[in-house]
Swiss-Prot record:
Family statement drawn from the similarity comment of this UniProt entry: Belongs to the bacterial ribosomal protein bL20 family.
Protein name, entry field: Large ribosomal subunit protein bL20c
Gene field: rpl20
Originating species: Populus trichocarpa (Western balsam poplar)
CC annotations in GO: chloroplast; ribonucleoprotein complex; ribosome
UniProt superkingdom: Eukaryota
Amino acid sequence: MTRIRRGYIARRRRTKIRLFTSSFRGAHSRLTRTMIQQKIKALFSAYRDRDRHKRNFRCLWVTRINAAIRENGVSYSYSTLINNLYKRQLLLNRKILAQLAILNRNCLYLISNDMIK
């Protein structure tokens, strides 16, 4: 039996992977086996960190709102503000409240003082 060279198909597959890993450092962008492993690892990390990204931002928003409210009054906290917002049916999500805490504190103070009364 004669030997068949798998040139075209294998080369096309490897160049596709090489294009993906071209920005990686060291052997991760040069050696085929490590390129494949690093591509799998990169795609897995991207998938995992999409949810982690959302989680981190929500945590940041909660922290910003809580810090801004506690500056205003000592006996008032984030959880009571959110609870009162739901009771009054004010549709302000955490992202908007965090932006108010940074850009327009007076507006946030007005909202939180309205909730206390």
